[in-house]
Amino acid sequence: MKRTAFFISDGTGITAEALGQSLLAQFEFIEFEKITLPYIDSLEKARKAVARIDKASEIDGNKPVIFDTIVNSEIRAEIRKSQGYMIDIFGTFLEPLEQELGSKSTYTVGKSHSIVSNSSYNRRIDAMNYALENDDGARVRYYNEADIILVGVSRSGKTPTCIYLALQYGIKAANFPLTEDDILDQRLPESLRSYREKIFGLTIDPERLAVIRNERKPNSKYASIKQCNYEVEEVELMYRRERIPYLNSTDYSVEEISTRIMMMTGIERHIR
């Protein structure tokens, strides 16, 4: 089944996307075409958005799902005229919150993002630069600055997790790929041993690893199920021998991997 989902906002659309994506992810047997419409901050833009929604409804034969974070009530009312099923995020939550707090909302466009301090922004950028500069074992001499060092076989999810930890939490995360020689030795590489307390391992089901590697190097030894089985078995054995905490990333999104790592290690987020 195919449905269209619109994320509509009078700002960047990040909040509508974040909540909408989380809800849609619960319906794994439905294919969603996702469309973000940011800065819908006038009635004219709202009418154009309605036209797109109605066209999608006609093509799909189903109502598009609309997630909106529009502050202006007139613009929201205009969007509501469309042939879509509208989930009004601010309207749903602000009114009961106003009643509970005994205070009216200021209804400020883009407020959720304007409150981020300069220090948080700088921390996020520093962590992101660190993740990129210390990707794939490139610069181990800066590992003393790391909050965490992810290790694992090639294509087990290290890089996207490091980037997410940096962007979302301001965590400085480096990653180091464990080669066939490393896992054959069954010891941490020499360059990592002085940072043992920062090391966290990722693993992955061999079948999933083979699929991912075949996208990169199809029909190669590197992507064969035999090679993937071997590397995963050996790296998990090394984790246990070296007493390295680790997580199987197969069934988790990068958001879930990051959250579980923080829970397992006790690392605190640096930005909020």
From Swiss-Prot:
This is Putative phosphoenolpyruvate synthase regulatory protein. It is an enzyme of class 2 (transferase). Belongs to the pyruvate, phosphate/water dikinase regulatory protein family. PSRP subfamily. ADP binds at residues 152-159. The lineage of its organism: Bacteria, Pseudomonadati, Pseudomonadota, Gammaproteobacteria, Oceanospirillales. Its EC number is 2.7.11.33, 2.7.4.28. It catalyses: [pyruvate, water dikinase] + ADP = [pyruvate, water dikinase]-phosphate + AMP + H(+); [pyruvate, water dikinase]-phosphate + phosphate + H(+) = [pyruvate, water dikinase] + diphosphate. HAMAP family: PSRP. Keywords: Kinase, Nucleotide-binding, Serine/threonine-protein kinase, Transferase. InterPro entries: Kinase-pyrophosphorylase, PSRP. Pfam families: Kinase-PPPase (PF03618). Bifunctional serine/threonine kinase and phosphorylase involved in the regulation of the phosphoenolpyruvate synthase (PEPS) by catalyzing its phosphorylation/dephosphorylation. GO terms for molecular function: ADP binding; ATP binding; phosphotransferase activity, phosphate group as acceptor; protein serine/threonine kinase activity.
